[in-house]
């Protein structure tokens, strides 16, 4: 698969970077809100269920607007790819339970650390159809700088 990671490579790449930045901003907000709802309800599981219900409704609305040609592709899609939803459930359930005890910042620090490690592995091997971006010394150095930066923000 062709490498398309240069954010200066046109309007689409910059738009993608901005969208992902906004998604990243939303993760700790979602974590804090779901965690707080879990405390108010005395049930992190109920808070997670409400988060999933809202997410399902929004996804369903987007699906109704989207091109429907994907339906005929469902039977040929590798079945293991549908397990991705389990990772979402694990994240939302774990952040709802752990964050009130561990702190949003600490929880997100370890989420980011896990994301950096798994993203590097997925990119290096091109897992799940991802574009291959081999792990070089420079990339490892960049990841370590990011890890150190996240650690600094948590310990400042």
Where do the language-model regions lie?
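Hydrophobic/aromatic residues within the transmembrane alpha-helices of Major Facilitator Superfamily
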Residues: 25, 29, 57, 86, ...
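Membrane-interface interhelical linkers
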Residues: 2-22, 36-40, 56-81, 125, ...
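Hydrophobic core positions of alpha-helical segments in small-molecule transporters
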Residues: 50, 110-111, 138-141
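Juxtamembrane helix-loop-helix junctions in multi-pass membrane proteins
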Residues: 32-53
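Structural motif at transmembrane-helix junctions in multi-pass transporters
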Residues: 39-43, 94-110, 129
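Hydrophobic transmembrane alpha-helices of multi-pass small-molecule transport proteins
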Residues: 136-154
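Hydrophobic alpha-helical transmembrane segments of multi-pass membrane transport proteins
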Residues: 25-29, 33, 62, 79-105, ...
């Amino acid at each position: 698969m062709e490498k398309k990671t240069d954010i200066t490579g046109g309007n689409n790449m910059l738009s993608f970077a901005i969208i992902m930045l906004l998604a990243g901003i939303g993760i700790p907000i979602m974590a804090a809100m779901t965690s707080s709802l879990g405390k108010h309800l005395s049930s992190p599981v109920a808070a997670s269920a409400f988060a999933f219900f809202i997410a399902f409704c929004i996804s369903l609305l987007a699906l109704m607007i989207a091109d429907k040609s994907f339906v005929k592709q469902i039977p040929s899609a590798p079945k293991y790819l549908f397990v991705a939803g389990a990772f979402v459930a694990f994240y939302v359930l774990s952040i709802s339970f752990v964050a009130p005890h561990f702190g949003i910042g600490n929880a997100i620090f370890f989420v980011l650390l896990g994301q950096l490690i798994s993203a590097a592995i997925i990119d290096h091997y091109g897992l799940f159809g991802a574009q291959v971006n081999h792990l070089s010394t420079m990339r490892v150095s960049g990841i370590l700088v990011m890890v150190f930066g996240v650690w600094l923000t948590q310990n400042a």
